[in-house]
């Protein structure tokens, strides 16, 4: 049996409070809205009760953040792509921000189990003045649990339409990509953190983002396998390779906290679910 689930989230600023309205179909839900930072920022947790995806499953997530609203979204656990007999398992996420909206898209990692056929699509659309901090973390198997990624294929698509596009394929049979120093160099976790804007970044703010991330990198255990760049005036990207998810997540969380402070003048308040 395959699952086809959709979830639409719509955040609006009402009387200075970011309010969520949502519609779902299938096994994809959102938990109660929380406001640990006050009414201006709405925290939510997305849950997928089946716990993972197999061949033929699809998850479609549509998120809109209205003018002036601020949403932070995470998940309670990893997205797991299990072995497939042929059909791909697909997750599609579209984030759309209106003018002056802010959003933080901070799901936990996606785990690729051996034998999976998986696709992950993530797209952003930002109106002028909107800003997004988002990350994407992928683990190739669970090697420390004796479950390496030795078969399967993963397609990744990340896009800010008309501005920036990343598209790649990881095939477990591609030993040059997985093992070469010019590829993943034997690392089994890859992660990216993005700061994306609806308007071109002015140089002082761009430098704040770059310098803040580089200061964290210089003191981090992953400094030799991470870097931060500005490939477009509307995008700043930090990328990292790591032997395990925990190290990559530690780096991303630290840079996220710095970016929140220097770019938005807001202290980082971690979602409560992360402490469980």
From Swiss-Prot:
Chaperone listed as a keyword: yes
Pfam families attached to this UniProt entry: UreD
Gene Ontology annotations for the cellular component aspect, listed alphabetically: cytoplasm
An example molecular function term from Gene Ontology annotations: nickel cation binding
Subcellular localization: Cytoplasm
Top-level division of the source organism's lineage: Bacteria
UniProt-listed InterPro entries: UreD (IPR002669)
Disulphides: none
Predominant cellular place of this UniProt entry's protein: cytoplasm
Keywords: Chaperone, Cytoplasm, Nickel insertion
Quaternary structure and interacting proteins, as annotated: UreD, UreF and UreG form a complex that acts as a GTP-hydrolysis-dependent molecular chaperone, activating the urease apoprotein by helping to assemble the nickel containing metallocenter of UreC. The UreE protein probably delivers the nickel.
Chain's role: Required for maturation of urease via the functional incorporation of the urease nickel metallocenter.
Family per record: Belongs to the UreD family.
Protein name as it appears in the record: Urease accessory protein UreD
